[in-house]
């Protein structure tokens, strides 16, 4: 496996996929596990991921995709619709704490779980009161998206993060409102085909343009 810096230098956003090439199932499982394990603020995990690979699944989501992005969906091996919560109940957040206890996060100090639980809920309620809860949870989905992109690249799998979509239509298709969810983006996955974008040198602003030391 390549080191992370090499992957960062080589990864690019794929424009065209080879529809004949499919991602091995074991690799798909690994990528979905990376999504599940992605970090989030106070471990709140305010997300849900819909995964598709069949023509039936693609046809389902295509009405939410504008013409210029349809080839990405049509020819990819798999796609993931990343969604974030628009609301989280106390019961949902308590479940997170229960899973943490079950996973052995507090073996020596079980009483900590109550403090962690109350702090997590307070943090979520703070964002509700600030009126930016939906934006906050969407930011967490972007963290998961980044993990997915680089995990895919580490396996030689190409990807495209897509914001060019009809979010309201996607919400309707997947019945997200009733699930207290909102669509945030789609990531397509597969293998490149005749993609001139892959031949262009990577271009970013210089180190000094974006990095500034406070030391």
Predicted regions span which residues?
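Acidic, surface-exposed loops and disordered segments
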Residues: 1-215
């Amino acid at each position: 496996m390549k080191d992370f810096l090499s992957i960062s230098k080589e990864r690019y956003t794929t424009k065209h996929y080879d529809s004949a090439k499919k991602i091995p199932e074991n690799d798909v499982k690994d990528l979905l596990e990376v999504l599940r394990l992605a970090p989030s603020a106070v471990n709140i995990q305010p997300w849900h991921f819909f995964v598709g690979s069949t023509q039936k699944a693609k046809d389902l989501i295509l009405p939410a995709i504008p013409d210029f992005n349809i080839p990405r969906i049509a020819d990819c091996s798999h796609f993931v619709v990343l969604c974030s919560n628009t609301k989280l109940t106390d019961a949902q957040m308590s479940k997170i704490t229960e899973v943490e206890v079950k996973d052995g996060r507090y073996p020596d100090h079980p009483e900590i779980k109550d403090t962690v639980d109350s702090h997590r809920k307070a943090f979520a309620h703070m964002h509700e009161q600030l009126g930016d809860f939906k934006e906050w949870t969407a930011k967490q989905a972007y963290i998961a998206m980044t993990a997915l992109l680089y995990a895919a690249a580490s396996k030689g799998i190409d990807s495209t993060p897509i914001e060019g979509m009809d979010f309201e239509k996607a919400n309707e298709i997947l019945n997200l409102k009733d699930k207290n969810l909102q669509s945030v983006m789609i990531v397509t996955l597969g293998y490149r085909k005749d993609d001139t974008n892959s031949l262009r040198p990577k271009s970013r602003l210089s180190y000094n343009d974006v990095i500034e030391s406070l030391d």
